[in-house]
Amino acid sequence: DRKSWIELARRWHALPVAIVIDPGIDICIERNESRPDRPFGGEVVRRMVSEIRRSQRGLEREGFRQVWKLTSPDAVDAATMTRVPLWTDKRGDEGPFDIIGDVHGCADELQELLTKLGYDVSWSSADGTRKVAVSHPQRRKAVFVGDLVDRGPNSTDVLRIAMSMVASGAAHVVQGNHDRKLERWLAGRKVTIAHGLQQTIDQLQAESEGFRQSLPKFLSDLRSHVWLDQGRLAVAHAGLKAEMIGRGSGAVREFALFGETTGETDEFGLPVRADWA
């Protein structure tokens, strides 16, 4: 019953994956005939293989995040399993860190803050493309707590700074609810365009097509939270329960974005947050 496996994974905020072993009908019949405790014939094996192949097509819809298929005995023999940390798990990064809260489009203030913290911020322009490089002489790293955009006068330069710092390894960025809303708008999803988002949209209209095209991947790659410094530090936008740290699920992302909610929405269409801390 694969449904119970999916439910178990979700309960513990894990990402379910599937490994499908399908070496072919002939191999399955041969292996079945070599087992004296299996009295059913080849037709039963054919039906079972056919059913398994039909069900494979729905594994992603069932909730499996990744599916690996091994289609021969050689593939099975050659397969290895490697444990890979989830993208939230950056415990090996020990900093030191500067944690920066919601910037909300205030690029000048962000640059002033970074300068006061000892970062070198250098702007350049080539072929009409505005670029920025940010580094710290002592290799400190910024951790942005989300909500880079909306409300402020210059969300585009805030994005430039954050994108440059992530690309160079000078920063981590977790996703805020405003960042996710912009991501959804860029993907053509239906969102409520309130005052803050409209400001960001207007600012983006003045940017190059290349810059606008670089945003969807950056925003979609933002993690729900980041786990740092050998497990001593976890950073999320709205908060996170201890059992969710370092885990990956839709529930973890929603909690990190909005905190614990009551299930209701306010007059702005935003989730009503419960007092949970």
Predicted regions and their residues:
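Glycine-rich phosphate-binding loop used to anchor ATP phosphates in small-molecule kinases
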Residues: D1-I21
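Conserved GTP-binding G-domain of TRAFAC-class P-loop NTPases and closely related GTPase folds
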Residues: R11, P23-R83
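Short glycine-/polar-rich loops that comprise or flank the Walker A/P-loop
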Residues: W12-V17, G63-Q66, R140, G169-A171
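Short, solvent-exposed loop/turn segments at secondary-structure junctions
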Residues: D26, H104-G105, D179-R180, L240-E243
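Active-site neighborhood of divalent metal-dependent phosphoester bond hydrolases
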Residues: V44, P137-R139, R151-V235, A242, ...
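N-terminal active-site segment of His-dependent metallophosphoesterases
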Residues: A75-L159
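Short hydrophobic beta-strand that contains or immediately precedes a catalytic carboxylate
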Residues: I99-G101, F144, V173-Q175, V235-A236
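Conserved beta-sheet core of the metallophosphoesterase superfamily
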Residues: M244, L270-A277
